Amino acid sequence: MSKALIPVITTRGLAAVFNAQNTGLSAEITHIALGDHGRTPSKNEVGLVNERMRIAIADGERIDDYQIHLTGLADGDTEFWVREIGFILKDGTMLAVWSDTDPLAYKSAEVPLLLAFDLVLAALPANSVNIIGTGANLSLAAWGEQLAAVAAANVDNMARHVELLFRVNDLEKG
């Protein structure tokens, strides 16, 4: 599912970015917060209204001076509709918040939720935000060899079942 998310840069997030720049550093996004309270977000927010889960960013990259791509994996027993997302800096400040009364996704206890975001940060100075991830590559391309092996095993299993079906049919005829 692909939905355009337009997060609101928070006042405290903007201040954190400028403070980092004044010391010669870049602000660092390290976590994604997920919650279930839908609303119209405000620049004055300091946290999600009802945060249900906070996940470390798995991987990320800079697309250009104002755009970053980041991924995360929401796993665990918690179940809820994702209606609010916060992008959290290393110091705990919420840089940006997105929310809507229509849910973005459902976080199931049974299936991990893979999240991927492209954030355009045109309201911030160029290259002022970096991504700090765990190094886990969640790209499907990284899992290509394993997926191909599973697919080959499935096809082999189906071929055995078809062969068995033909044998049963022959026995029933005779």
Language-model features, listed with the residues they occupy:
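N-terminal assembly/attachment segments of tailed bacteriophage virion structural proteins
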Residues: M1-N137, D170-G174
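Heptad-repeat coiled-coil amphipathic alpha-helices that mediate oligomerization/assembly
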Residues: S139-E172
